[in-house]
Amino acid sequence: MKKIEKLTEKEMANIIGGKYYGNGVTCGKHSCSVDWGKATTCIINNGAMAWATGGHQGNHKC
């Protein structure tokens, strides 16, 4: 179970975040980083699905 706390707008303004693209890639304001374990899993799973379905599946976010 997760503990969730509601933040005020002032508290939200102090949070510096980035964007997670769902495939192991996360980008912030000035740079991006890759979780290679997650990225490798996505590449293998998407490749297998694309092969098994003749290219109709396999481009989903992991």
From Swiss-Prot:
One biological process term from GO is: killing of cells of another organism
Taken from the UniProt entry, a GO cellular component term is: extracellular region
Tell me where it resides. Answer: Secreted
- Principal subcellular localization: secreted
Q: Which branch of life, at top level?
A: Bacteria
Give the signal sequence positions.
none
Q: Where is this region: Hydrophobic?
A: 40-52
Q: Which UniProt keywords apply?
A: Antibiotic, Antimicrobial, Bacteriocin, Disulfide bond, Plasmid, Secreted
**Matching InterPro entries:** Bacteriocin_IIa, Bacteriocin_IIa_CS, Bacteriocin_IIa_dom_sf, Bacteriocin_signal_seq
Listed as disulfide-bonded, the cysteine pairs are C27-C32, C42-C62
Residues cleaved off as propeptide:
1-18
Biological role: Bactericidal activity (effective inhibitor of L.monocytogenes).
Q: Which family does it belong to?
A: Belongs to the bacteriocin class IIA/YGNGV family.
- Spell out the protein name for this chain: Bacteriocin pediocin PA-1
Source species, please? Pediococcus acidilactici
Q: What is the lineage of its organism?
A: Bacteria, Bacillati, Bacillota, Bacilli, Lactobacillales
